[in-house]
Curated annotation (Swiss-Prot):
Pfam families: NAP. Residues 389-391 form a propeptide. The modification N6-acetyllysine is found at residue 116. The gene is NAP1L1. The modification 5-glutamyl polyglycine is found at residues 359-360. This is Nucleosome assembly protein 1-like 1. The keyword Ligase does not apply.
Length: 391
């Protein structure tokens, strides 16, 4: 068996040498064509493919043979470093616990501002002229005369229109402006979300397991009797004993929704379908009515239940993964910065961040391409001494 493997390896090495010889003897398009042809021939050879697969499997099983080759006394020292790493993870967990305490502390300071936001949106409080003053960047160079003219025109338009009170459809607009949320909102959800007055986040009390609750406050409506719909997210804030090195801060481990008390005929999470069935023998036809689930934002409050075994099917895992992402996004971005998602400014900032990364990547690609196409380019000249990188 070893002789066969050695023979296959020799053939593979010889074929690779042939590619190198072709590249040395010929240049230009002919070299590329012949190299491609030789590659195709090699990939059609089952012995070569088997040898390549065996080599790749070996690399996967032993990502670094260096560690295995270390003397026993050195391996002991590596184990000592791993134990230190576990202690680092435990300290990191303490750090995140204190961060959670700070979030709870500052949530109290933010709340008066969020309460004022709620009052303005829902026409409970009318902001003063001073509170409404805002100077967008694009108005920096506009003359006072033009500003006054624009103000007069705006006042005329306001006189012609009836005051809509507050900021209508504020949260619905926020949801529709954010792709992550707009994908959840169906057309039949929109009339209900027009009644959404506020979204709040509540953090777990000190000494309690880390968690947070999203509260969706609704005004009285024709769809359900609940005033508040809730979604609770449970978090793990300490390293897993079975895999301590995977700890990278608190992570959402599960969530619980709430029961929605729908009024008769208003449950948008269900739909009724009718099917016609034909009897095979008699040929008679009957109509069967069936109630099935329906796509809706309000399915957000009925997440899949995780069994005690923790095993979920692929669909449930995907739903929960998306659910956790949405819960985190609402807590970290939407609730504290809702006005910027209402106006679209936060979305533009997010897009700019992605554009800058893309432009940098494109520029790097262009530079690399120029170096490869430069006949005088010597890669050895560009090699820098090894640098110490901080993680």
């Amino acid at each position: 068996m070893a002789d066969i493997d050695n023979k296959e390896q020799s053939e593979l090495d010889q074929d690779l040498d042939d590619v190198e010889e072709v590249e040395e003897e010929e240049t230009g398009e002919e070299t590329k064509i012949k190299a491609r042809q030789l590659t195709v021939q090699m990939m059609q050879n089952p012995q070569i493919l088997a040898a390549l697969q065996e080599r790749l499997d070996g690399l996967v099983e032993t990502p670094t043979g260096y560690i295995e080759s270390l003397p026993r006394v050195v391996k002991r020292r590596v184990n000592a470093l791993k134990n230190l790493q576990v202690k680092c993870a435990q300290i990191e967990a303490k750090f995140y616990e204190e961060v959670h305490d700070l979030e709870r502390k500052y949530a109290v300071l933010y709340q008066p501002l969020f309460d004022k936001r709620f009052e303005i949106i829902n026409a409970i409080y009318e902001p003063t002229e001073e509170e409404c003053e805002w100077k967008p960047d694009e108005e920096d160079e506009i003359s006072e005369e033009l500003k006054e003219k624009a103000k007069v025109e705006d006042e005329k338009k306001d006189e012609e229109k009836e005051d809509p009170k507050g900021i209508p459809e504020f949260w619905l607009t926020v949801f529709k402006n954010v792709d992550l949320l707009s994908d959840m909102v169906q057309e039949h959800d929109e009339p209900i979300l027009k009644h959404l007055k506020d979204i709040k986040v509540k953090f777990s009390d000190a000494g309690q397991p880390m968690s947070f609750v999203l509260e969706f406050h609704f005004e009285p409506n024709e769809y359900f009797t609940n005033e508040v719909l809730t979604k609770t997210y449970r978090m793990r804030s300490e390293p897993d004993d079975s895999d301590p090195f995977s700890f990278d801060g608190p992570e959402i481990m599960g969530c619980t929704g709430c029961q929605i008390d729908w009024k008769k005929g208003k449950n948008v999470t269900l739909k009724t379908i009718k099917k016609k069935q034909k009897h095979k023998g008699r040929g008679t036809v009957r109509t069967v009515t069936k109630t099935v689930s329906n796509d809706s934002f309000f399915n957000f409050f009925a997440p899949p239940e995780v069994p005690e075994s923790g095993d979920l099917d692929d669909d449930s895992e995907a739903i929960l993964a998306a659910d956790f992402e949405i819960g985190h996004f609402l807590r970290e971005r939407i609730i504290p910065r809702s006005v910027l998602y209402f106006t679209g400014e936060a979305i533009e900032d997010d897009d700019d961040d992605y554009d800058e990364e893309g432009e940098e990547a494109d520029e790097e690609g262009e530079e690399e391409g120029d170096e490869e196409n430069d006949p005088d380019y010597d890669p050895k000249k560009d090699q820098n001494p090894a640098e110490c990188k901080q993680q």
